[in-house]
Amino acid sequence: MTELARVSSALLELSDGQGSPRSAAFNDIYHAADGPAEVTRVFMAPARLAERFAAAGNDTMTIAELGFGTALNFAVLADTFVGCAPAGARLHFISVEKYPIADPEFTAIARQRAVDLPVYDALAKHYPARLAGWHRRHFHAGRVTLSLYYGDAADGLADLVRRMARSVDHWLLDGFAPARNPDMWRDGLFRDIARLSSAGTTACTFSAAGRVRRGLERAGFQVRKVDQRPHKRHSTAAFYKGSRKGPLPTFRAPSEVTVMGAGLAGSCVARALAERGMDVRLVDDPARPATEIPAATVNPRLLADGSAQARQRLRSYLYSIHWLDRFHATACHGVLQLPGGRNTAPRLELLAAQYHDMGPWVRSVDAATAASVTGVPMRVGGLLLPGACTVDIGRLIRELREHPRIHLRAPEPTQVEPAQPRILCTGAAISEFEETGYLELLPVWGELQQVQITGGPRLPLVGDGFITPWGGGYSVGSSYEQSPWTPGRARAFNLDRFESWWANTIDAPLRYEAIGRVRGCRAVTSDRSPVIGPLHDPTGAPRKNQFISTGHGSHGTISAPFAADCLAAVLNGEFSVLDAEEDACVSGLRFLQRQARRGLRHGARPPAEEFG
């Protein structure tokens, strides 16, 4: 079995009686005992960051850091930013970390510091798993964004050089002393720091070593020493003088974006754009209302391998449970994955082996533990996902639209090559746009039954179908209809499967009453993966200002929020957290590439040469 690309945890120990954390591998402390004060005097004051935050207007300020460590720099800067920046300003904090602190140790650190720096609570709750690559989290209702790279700093910065359109406003170079961690202070890193900077970009570091000063100077920075007595003799501050070789131009995000489709995918996109300061025309067709499922589970559909698709699913799941957690329509009480359907007991054991050391977000449980968490006697164990959510889709859509920058509009005639970006999120109806015909997207109907169960589980169960608690009882289902079934067929299918699955997994008699149903139509791609990113012309080139989020199928609660962040980040000059292989799994370009080999299938049409 191919393993997921994971990173090693830091070897952490406590120095002196004041509890300053120390890296055993590098024999160096993460920060002084007066950590928050040290952050201010070394990394903020020399660059006048508080003043710059206050003058940020409605723009995004980008801070980048080498060495995430205990997250102290991030927490102090986030707290300062929220306290003094205008309400319309945003902070994008980018950090790289080769050896992240393990989850139990980070949780203990966060618990101690959250009293003074509350962002620690939110970060510890959704601390990224040890999956190599980028992770993103949002705080303070979207005003503060953390993009965290797990891996070598050189790889993380090189990826930013390739993909980020915005320049960095300020650098925090905080990767242990050069003598103890020389790889962090290579000339190649300084060159990439310069490539990601523009004239006036500042940098601060605790180190005053000549190697550090010379590296910054060779990269185009003007360097000065900062008196740090009585704490130490000097630290270093610098500003970028500019160069002809690669500093990024000033980036301007679009002032307005049109989102076609106001269901779950479109409303997620609209909210992600609005929280990044863009006005959104959210086009809602009342003739095609979104399916409002009262209780949809956020179930990751984990894969037991190290493929790009496995990484993409895990990244999507962990991001989405974090993002959805702040809305009233979401209840994060966990989900229990049981044997059933394709997820046999041996396959669940493979999944447990694959993910057991990547954090507390998943764990294998036996039948006794399963009974304890669900409140019903269980015949089998399974995989417990403690942070998984249940979402009231209709309520969530209404919540997502409640933002002053989102403006609901009725459909209008399609414009040709609009000057402002347009994002298509119309589900199965997306095939009506001529330029989307190559996407291999099909409508698949489905139905779930609403039942009342005497003595039912208190957590959602997924396996051979699902049993999900909601305010009025339970939802069970659902059918998967390539063409709509005759009336009553879906009800019989769902209830028969529900009764059989209950008998095989729950050690108690089933007493229930069917009380209703919900029908809807999913947009499903031929490979069951969503479509996220630009639309493409017949040559495979991305169409200017034309993007898409669709094909979320039965798992829109996982992929739709994640897709929204990927698209909004790119439009705001940031970057998607997907690596190139993961992006290929969700790009619509994959269909054009397959069609070049085997022709059109699954109802696909050649893409239009022009719009209209």
Q: Language-model segments: which ranges?
A:
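A short glycine-rich, Lys/Arg-flanked "PGG" loop and its adjoining helix->strand segment in the class I
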Residues: 186-199
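Helical element adjacent to the flavin cofactor pocket in flavoenzyme catalytic cores
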Residues: 382-415, 425-430
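Active-site substrate-recognition segment that forms the wall
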Residues: 244-276, 285, 292-297, 302, ...
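Rossmann-like AdoMet
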Residues: 1-61, 78-115, 302, 584, ...
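Dinucleotide-binding Rossmann-like beta1-alpha1 core, especially the glycine-rich loop
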Residues: 295-373
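The AdoMet/dcAdoMet-binding core of the Class I SAM-like
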Residues: 55-166, 187
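C-terminal catalytic lobe of FAD-dependent flavoproteins
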Residues: 512-612
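Short beta-strand to alpha-helix junction loop
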Residues: 204, 305-316, 342-344, 382-399, ...
